[in-house]
């Protein structure tokens, strides 16, 4: 493999006769407060080849079933390597995902060089997280990565490719490429199609487009205030903690390897899909919060008191949010926000509120309707904190000029539109 930060890979897929439903399953960090979703998925996948059998839904992290599931995952990976993953693509996979609104999201699946990525605060590598990485979330995920012989990605990267040089040219010639899969995804995930990109000339074109995005002079023209900084080529759009876990595992493995092994070991790379942030099919959605164990009236009073304690702002604030529970909804305007984005101010409030209220917990929810539903039971006090829309134009600007955004700031699309596990790659030797 080349030293590019994103490159062609040996990608594995099941035989052509294996249907996407139930082979492909949604990212494990979705529907964490809705175990019934995962029960339905398991029913659909029972006794059939499915990536659900080689991943650990976060709904099961820390449960008595965790150890048994991890053992089952490792056994199933070995079975799939021998008898299920019978097709190999050496190159990229061009994908098209038809979303709930009918738009088609284009992407390229390849391998991220983990030596070109870092989640450490203040680092400026070619590949950067768009949000803060909560390092405490990595160890539970490392349990899955350690000892695994396969990986299957739900990581989605974003390229700042205003001229559409990287992905879109492949889409124009997709009918000339070998088709790989074409079908519906389980539980309302939409339609997914994929084509193999193995022609050396096409791979060279993709690599050249990536090299142009990494050009220091072009980066300095785009971001004059960041002149002299290493160019940022890709930002992590989704799956930040999955990529961070792959990085942590690679750093853990490195000291056990020779210099030659470090250059070629498959765990140095992580499969991911790259999309163009400028695509009209890429929607950046706010991630809402649901606070369990407290009603909206009580939370409103606490938030109002906390806001007043922040001191007097010298400028007019435009930070707005909504609080909702089973009894209704109210609008909130923050007068003295301590952070530049509403989500940052909310996180600062929760950082003070939660330790002072034992038994109150928070979950991060994709989709306003889901957040409202979770806070709608009068018998179980809960409040949905509904955040305003997030402008995707601010994403690269915020990361390049200001560092990472607050954790759980945004999500790319609705929960059902997350990347499904599909392609696989060997990471063990």
Where are these regions (language model features)?
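N-terminal extension/subdomain marker
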Residues: 1-190, 194, 198, 221-224, ...
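Short beta-strand segments
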Residues: 158, 236-237, 273, 386-387
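Metal-assisted phosphate- and nucleotidyl-transfer catalytic regions
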Residues: 223, 308-323, 361-364, 377-378, ...
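Catalytic or ion-translocation cores adjacent to nucleophile or general acid/base/metal-coordination motifs
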Residues: 240-302
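C-terminal amphipathic alpha-helical segment
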Residues: 274-342
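Charged substrate- and nucleic-acid-binding regions of tRNA-handling and nucleotidyl-transfer enzymes
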Residues: 344-429
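Active-site beta-strand/loop microenvironment that shapes enzyme catalytic pockets
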Residues: 212-257
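Glycine-rich phosphate-binding "P-loop"
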Residues: 186-209, 334-338
């Amino acid at each position: 493999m080349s030293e590019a930060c994103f490159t062609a890979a040996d990608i594995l897929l099941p035989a052509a006769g294996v249907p996407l439903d139930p082979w492909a399953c949604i990212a494990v960090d979705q529907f964490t407060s809705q175990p019934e979703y995962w029960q339905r998925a398991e029913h659909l996948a029972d006794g059939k080849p499915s990536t659900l059998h080689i991943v650990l839904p976060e709904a099961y992290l820390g449960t008595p079933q965790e150890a048994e599931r991890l053992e089952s995952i490792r056994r199933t990976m070995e079975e799939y390597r021998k008898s299920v993953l019978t097709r190999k693509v050496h190159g990229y996979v061009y994908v098209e995902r038809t979303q709930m609104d009918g738009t088609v999201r284009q992407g390229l699946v390849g391998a991220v060089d983990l030596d070109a990525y870092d989640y450490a605060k203040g680092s400026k590598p070619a590949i950067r997280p768009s949000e803060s990485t909560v390092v405490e979330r990595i160890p539970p995920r490392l349990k899955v990565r350690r000892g695994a012989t396969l990986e299957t990605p739900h990581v989605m990267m974003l390229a700042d490719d205003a001229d559409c040089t990287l992905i879109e040219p492949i889409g124009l010639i997709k009918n000339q490429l070998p088709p790989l899969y074409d079908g519906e995804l389980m539980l309302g995930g939409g339609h997914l199609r994929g084509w193999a990109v193995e022609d050396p000339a096409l791979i060279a074109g993709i690599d050249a487009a990536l090299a142009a995005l990494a050009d220091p002079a072009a980066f300095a023209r785009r971001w004059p205030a960041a002149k002299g900084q290493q160019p940022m080529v890709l930002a992590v759009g989704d799956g930040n903690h999955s990529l961070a876990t792959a990085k942590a595992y690679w750093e853990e493995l490195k000291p056990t390897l020779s210099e030659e092994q470090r250059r070629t070991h498959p765990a140095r790379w992580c499969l991911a899909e790259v999309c163009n942030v400028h695509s009209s099919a890429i929607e950046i959605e706010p991630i809402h919060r649901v606070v369990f164990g407290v009603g909206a009236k009580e939370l409103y009073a606490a938030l109002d008191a906390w806001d007043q304690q922040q001191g007097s702002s010298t400028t007019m604030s435009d930070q707005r949010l909504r609080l909702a529970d089973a009894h209704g909804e109210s609008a909130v305007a923050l007068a003295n926000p301590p952070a530049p984005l509403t989500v940052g101010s909310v996180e600062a409030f929760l950082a003070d509120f939660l330790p002072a209220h034992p038994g109150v917990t928070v979950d991060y929810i994709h989709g306003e309707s889901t957040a409202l539903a979770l806070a709608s039971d009068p018998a179980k006090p809960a409040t949905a904190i509904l955040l305003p829309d997030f402008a995707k134009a601010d994403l690269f600007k915020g990361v390049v000029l200001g560092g990472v955004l607050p954790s759980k700031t945004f999500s790319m699309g609705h929960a059902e539109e997350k990347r499904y596990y599909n392609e696989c790659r060997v990471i063990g030797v």
